[in-house]
Every structure is written in structure tokens, then in C-alpha cells.
Design a protein with these regions (language model features):
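Conserved segment of the helicase C-terminal RecA-like domain
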Residues: 30-31, 137, 141-144, 148-151, ...
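Conserved helicase motor
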Residues: 81, 100-112, 128-132
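Conserved strand-helix element at the start of the C-terminal RecA-like helicase core
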Residues: 24-26, 32, 68-94, 98-102
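Structural recognition of the conserved hydrophobic beta-strand(s) that form the central parallel beta-sheet
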Residues: 22-28, 125-127, 143-144
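Non-catalytic terminal extensions of ATP-dependent helicases
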Residues: 211-403
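Post-DEXD/H (motif II) to motif III coupling segment of the RecA-like Helicase ATP-binding lobe
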Residues: 2-51
């Protein structure tokens, strides 16, 4: 994780700055070199303890057919929330009890879904790669339902670290003597990655520390300077693109009404910056901070009745939970405690309803143009007929444009 361009800085800061007599750092073999470098930079000592996997991990020698080859203890891995929900729906239609796990689920919901699998209430897990971190389940077999994922920039083949991390969930010690791995596509390539040798991580990610605020420039300018001047020997710079945009919003609209220290806190509030609704909410919170009314105007955002939430579908419930997360982080950043209990109650209610939707809801792949139901693994967002119509319309548009 120290090499992750978005979140790696948090692990780097923890290793360099945690105040404790003994620190346990767990990692894959390819991170050992860079972590030892960080420890030596601090003048500290370390003990290198290596663990071996106790259960064998076997790539099956036959192709996996969905849903015919499903067995109890299987975990099906997909790389989008939409595909996870569709697979879960299809399995429930076949009579299977299913737990659903993906990254944007509230922690309490993930915990409830894990508990259902642990106590035998469900026998199959359908999940994203969120299962690869912090989840310990009695999974007998991992099935990759696809071999490529969208990483925020492009759709690419899984890398070695991802395959090893996900596949390693199969074969829990004490329950299974060995774990199994299979795939709906590219089984041989996944097997090669699973048993391949890691490349060493040569740099870790850092972001500007708070002390850079003393520089006589605006925060957005400081971040741009940081990107150009930071020594690159064993460090790489965190992706600051979005935070620079947030800082520029504050500086252009509010100028000196928000000091740099507060601005730094505001731009580091975590939220999904791809969501326009959450971005607008963040801007509203910044605006009311600049107006000096963060406490009195917060009630507007948490004044949601349980009856209104009851009628919501899964998409809206997840969006509302993200909104509550953003409000909670904002209150923490500004030390506002008046709404802690209200936000906690709302998050609990939303989580309960999300569990209900995951258990009882049905989710299918549909053509975004005509609404026709598509196969779960259909490559495009439209049926073949609508795809051809859409392609023809685009050709006509281009022809008209050049007349």
C-alpha cells in the first residue's frame, strides 16, 4: 500500500511517524526493502519475521462454468459494484444464499454480510477486490469472474499483487487443507501471476506535511511547488490533482476568509470526488464555514426523517450514507460535536436498510437505451440492436458536422 498513488502517503506517514515502542508492519515480500529503508531513516531497528502459507493454493485445471460449477464456500470476484449485484441476483434466483461485499458498502453492512457467511446463513460470497484486505472468511475457492479491472484511468489486466492478494483468501487454515482458484476467463494467465515472483517496490508515496503551510504562498501554489521540487530518491509524490482543485475553489471564492490551516483541513476531508452531489455538498460546507455559520446551518443537512429513508432504493441509500460520512468528517475536522448522535443514528438506520436491499433486492443488467435485459457479462451498456443504432446516429452526426 505504501506505493499506492492515492492512499500510499497514509502508510508512509504511519511508518515514519507513529509514536510507539513496538510497531508491527505486515507486508508482501516486495515491500520489505522499501520499509526497511524507512525504518533506517528514522534511526530505528527492526526484526524481520517471515511467515509461510500453511495451506496449499491450487489453480484448478478446468474452466469454470457459471452458474453450473458453483459450490458452497465459493467466493466470486468481480470488479464493479454493478456486476457484483447482478451476479448475486442471478445466484439468488438459482436458490443460493449469498453474501455481498464491495468497497463502497458501509463498514457495518460489510460486517453484517461477513457474519451471515460465518454463521452459515449464506454459503456463497460475491465480492469486489475489497475482499483482499481486512476480511478473513472460510472460503474454499476464489473464482475470478473477470480478469480485467478499471483502475480509474483505463481498463487493464490484473497485476500480480492483486491476483496474489485476492486468491490468497482461499483455503483458510484450520478449515481447509488447501485452497482453490479458478477463473471464467484467462485462467492460465491468472495462474502465472499467482505463482510468479514479485518485483521489488522501490519508492513509497508521500504528501505535503502540515508544516509546509508556513511557506509564503497559497496552499494550491505550495502543492504545485511540492510536486516539482520533492526529492525523488525513494519517494514518489501522492496524486494532488484533486486537492489542488479543491484548494483553488476555496482561494478563488473565499480568499483570506479561510486561513491556510483550516483550508488544509477542508481539502483533506475524504469523499468520493467523482460524485457531483458530494462535491457540491463539500462546496456548501466550505461556503458556510467561510460565512462563519458551520454549526447553525448543519441541521439542514441532517434533518432527514426515518420515513423518508425507508422508501429509498439501494443507490440512494448508499449515496445518503456517503453524505453522512462526509458530514461526519467535516464535523471532526472542525471539532463540531453537536450532531454526532444524530449522524450516528442516521448511519445505523441507513445501514439496516442497505442490508435489507442486498438481501431482498433484484439487480439485472439492462440496455441503457431500450431497457432490454442483458446477460450479466454483456460487454457493452447497450444491446446489439441499440449499439448499431447508436453507431449509425454518431456517423450521421459526424457527417452533418462536416457539411
Amino acid at each position: 500500500m505504501v506505493a499506492d498513488s492515492d492512499r500510499g502517503w497514509a502508510w508512509t506517514e504511519a511508518i515514519l511517524g507513529v509514536n510507539a515502542d513496538v510497531v508491527h508492519v505486515c507486508m508482501s515480500p516486495n515491500a520489505i526493502h522499501i520499509v526497511k529503508m524507512l525504518i533506517k531513516m528514522c534511526g530505528d531497528t527492526y526484526t524481520d519475521i517471515r511467515h509461510k502459507r500453511n495451506s496449499r493454493l491450487i489453480v484448478e485445471d478446468h474452466d469454470f462454468i457459471f452458474p453450473d460449477d458453483i459450490r458452497d464456500g465459493d467466493a466470486l470476484v468481480a470488479f464493479s459494484r454493478r456486476k457484483v449485484l447482478m451476479l448475486a441476483t442471478l445466484l439468488k434466483k438459482e436458490g443460493y444464499k449469498v453474501s455481498v461485499i464491495y468497497g463502497s458498502l458501509p463498514y457495518s453492512v460489510r460486517k453484517a454480510e461477513v457474519a451471515r457467511f460465518l454463521n452459515g446463513e449464506s454459503r456463497i460470497v460475491v465480492c469486489t477486490d475489497a475482499i483482499g484486505m481486512g476480511v478473513n472468511l472460510p472460503i474454499r475457492r476464489i473464482i475470478f469472474t473477470e480478469s480485467k479491472k478499471f483502475d480509474g484511468k483505463s481498463k487493464r489486466f490484473l497485476n500480480m499483487s492483486e491476483v496474489k492478494q485476492i486468491a490468497g483468501r482461499a483455503g483458510r487454515k484450520g478449515m481447509y487443507d488447501q485452497g482453490y482458484v479458478n477463473s471464467i476467463e484467462d485462467r492460465d494467465q491468472i495462474g502465472e501471476l499467482l505463482h510468479g515472483r514479485y518485483e521489488q517496490i522501490t519508492s513509497c508515496v508521500i504528501q505535503p506535511p502540515r508544516k509546509v503551510l508556513d511557506m509564503p504562498y497559497s496552499l494550491s501554489e505550495i502543492f504545485k511547488i511540492w510536486l516539482k521540487t520533492i526529492e525523488k530518491k525513494c519517494f514518489s509524490v501522492a496524486d494532488l490533482k484533486n486537492r489542488i482543485k479543491l484548494a483553488e475553489y476555496i482561494e478563488k471564492k473565499h480568499g483570506e476568509k479561510i486561513n491556510k490551516d483550516l483550508e488544509y483541513s477542508l481539502i483533506n476531508i475524504p469523499f468520493d470526488e467523482n460524485s457531483e452531489k458530494l462535491k457540491y455538498l463539500w462546496q456548501d460546507l466550505v461556503d458556510m464555514t467561510a460565512d462563519g455559520e458551520p454549526v447553525s446551518r448543519m441541521w439542514y443537512y441532517v434533518d432527514t426523517e426515518s420515513e423518508d429513508i425507508e422508501a429509498m432504493k439501494l443507490d440512494d441509500l448508499e449515496q445518503l450514507y456517503k453524505k453522512m460520512d462526509l458530514l461526519n468528517s467535516y464535523c471532526n475536522a472542525l471539532n463540531i460535536s453537536e450532531y454526532d448522535e444524530r449522524i450516528r443514528i442516521l448511519k445505523e438506520k441507513i445501514s439496516e436498510l442497505i442490508v435489507r436491499e442486498l438481501t431482498n433486492g433484484e439487480f439485472f443488467n439492462k440496455c441503457k437505451r431500450c431497457g432490454k435485459r442483458l446477460e450479466w457479462n454483456h460487454r457493452f451498456g447497450m444491446c446489439e440492436k441499440c449499439y448499431e443504432i447508436n453507431k449509425l446516429e454518431r456517423m450521421r452526426y459526424k457527417a452533418d458536422k462536416w457539411r
